[in-house]
Amino acid sequence: MTEDNAQLRRTWNDLAEKVRYHRDRYYNEQPEIPDADFDALFKQLQQLEEDHPELAVPDSPTMVVGAPVAEQSSFDNVEHLERMLSLDNVFDEQELRDWLGRTPAKQYLTELKIDGLSIDLVYRNGQLERAATRGDGRVGEDITANARVIEDIPHQLQGTDEYPVPAVLEIRGEVFITVEDFPEVNAQRIADGGKPFANPRNAAAGSLRQKNIEDVKKRRLRMISHGIGFTEGFSPASQHDAYLALAAWGLPTSPYTEAVTDPEDVVKKVSYWADHRHDALHEMDGLVIKVDDIASQRALGSTSRAPRWAIAYKYPPEEVTTKLLDIQVGVGRTGRVTPFAVMEPVLVAGSTVSMATLHNQSEVKRKGVLIGDTVVIRKAGEVIPEVLGPVVELRDGTEREYIFPTLCPECGTRLAPAKADDVDWRCPNMQSCPGQLSTRLTYLAGRGAFDIEALGEKGAEDLIRTGILLDESGLFDLTEDDLLSSNVYTTNAGKVNASGKKLLDNLQKSKQTDLWRVLVALSIRHVGPTAARALAGRYHSIQALIDAPLEELSETDGVGTIIAQSFKDWFEVDWHKAIVDKWAAAGVTMEEEVGEVAEQTLEGLTIVVTGGLEGFTRDSVKEAIISRGGKASGSVSKKTDYVVVGENAGSKATKAEELGLRILDEAGFVRLLNTGSADE
């Protein structure tokens, strides 16, 4: 063996050892690295074997499925009737097109790749005989007792004339916890004295391996069937036909599966779900594409670990590791001081991030992160990235503990909790703390308040730091002369620039706005758009609100004692009242005419709107629902009364169909608004 070959073999051995180690940790619920890091290791090993076929051996990690059942497992081993294969992955559009090019088909199925735990079910004459984990694809753990308490898994299949129950049926599926149920599952676990789960997949995997059936019942496990193994007395012509049969027998199938004939439509589906992955009822990490025709599947065959007739397109990771360089704090508009992580830039969920929230000092301690740690971060959609925790195994002793500041980093005021048991520490200098002032300005300029387009984060900070504004009370008195001292709103020649002129124009227009938006803009703690709408709708003026007794305020629908008390407390402060007085003097809306109140046609109804409507903007459709007594919700559940479906509707429409909810088009929605009934 030459020195070069020896080095290649050492490289292969090192990679193979890492892949085996991390795969075992993953399948036995002790992952040390995110899925994306494992995928990268696996792909590196695959590429090495493709470039140097002589390195591949029969037991290479690229040739095997899953991981052997752990020796310490408390469950019995059970052999699958037919091998339970994995899936090969592609990670970009070109790789997908290459696969489609060498795997032509009359029809493909696209299915969401559920981020859960694989399960194998065996039915004999319709009766559930056993359930098992994937294991190494040949042998898994017998988890029949746990599977029997999952409501989605029928104990007895129900045959029909079209689909008689076969003598033997082996089902492949995925067990998961819905995104909606996960917070409650975690809350229950904490109440029981346990540590919270990091994510729904870990929760599902841990739950299936519980020995205590009562604990399994608490976890709200769900299951979706996504394939068949060995069968006797059942020979469907296509995957689609198989799913129809499974559904007829009472087995759950995915509401998101779609049939497509054009490869270009497959690419479009991948793109669609990249943007809508958080619309699904479960977590997903990719889209699975399958050749639908089963005869074609047999002709294409499989490798030792995966079928050639299916592929998984993996989306950019939402959990990755990076280095925690520092922990700093930011000051919010209500004085709350929030620690955040400063990290080495890393690509996560399709964007590069270098900062992530740590919520409060209690969370920093609970998560056990040290400055210098390698940490796992998560970013879901547009959500701010969050540090999940440290990779303790990678510590080298140079890490150091974070010490939470005792003084405000913006103004030097001593920090303190608002009350003894408050986990959040606050800067009490609300009147003149630059950090609070600039964030309050940014907030009141937002779409949910005055909607001042030309006043962004940099502009707000500039107005405060330069002393142009001492607080928000003088905002509507700004003039061109005032802006000449600005660094953001002036040209290099020292004149007011286009942004400055736009700001002054925005300010004039925003004075005449809805009263509820003015209430939101005041940054009264706990008073958000919902409470502000309710208060403005009942009292119609700031003065009437000030004069209203506390008990009366608290009885306002959607307000309650805490919000009412917060409102009263805010107006006890002289400089707060000065803000209102100066805004009023500048012509800002302080009362609104009591016009004809819209008929409460939607009273008590919860309505979800998905997709675009021709006659409404996003804000106006919400206003139309709320002003008629309805609740405009952003998520579909069993409690939803109507789902309004417009152009380019997301998977909320699919979920509504799955739940059997009433679905309306725009015309039906307008009828509902006007008459209280969607019927023609």
Curated annotation (Swiss-Prot):
UniProt name for this protein: DNA ligase
Limits of the BRCT domain: 597-680
The EC number(s) this enzyme carries: 6.5.1.2
Active site: 113 (n6-amp-lysine intermediate)
Entry keyword set: DNA damage, DNA repair, DNA replication, Ligase, Magnesium, Manganese, Metal-binding, NAD, Zinc
Species of the source: Corynebacterium glutamicum (strain R)
Gene that produces this protein: ligA
Family (UniProt): Belongs to the NAD-dependent DNA ligase family. LigA subfamily.
Keyword check for Iron: no
Top-level taxonomic group: Bacteria
Any Gene Ontology CC annotation: cytosol
InterPro entries: BRCT_dom (IPR001357), BRCT_dom_sf (IPR036420), DisA/LigA_HHH (IPR041663), DNA_ligase (IPR001679), DNA_ligase_AS (IPR018239), DNA_ligase_CS (IPR033136), DNAligase_adenylation (IPR013839), DNAligase_N (IPR013840)
Named cofactor requirement(s): Mg(2+); Mn(2+)
Residues binding NAD(+), per UniProt: 35-39, 86-87, 111, 134, 174, 290, 314
Catalytic activity line of the entry: NAD(+) + (deoxyribonucleotide)n-3'-hydroxyl + 5'-phospho-(deoxyribonucleotide)m = (deoxyribonucleotide)n+m + AMP + beta-nicotinamide D-nucleotide
Binding site for Zn(2+): 408, 411, 427, 433
HAMAP family the UniProt entry points to: DNA_ligase_A (MF_01588)
GO biological process: DNA repair; DNA replication
GO molecular function: DNA ligase (NAD+) activity; metal ion binding
Function: DNA ligase that catalyzes the formation of phosphodiester linkages between 5'-phosphoryl and 3'-hydroxyl groups in double-stranded DNA using NAD as a coenzyme and as the energy source for the reaction. It is essential for DNA replication and repair of damaged DNA.
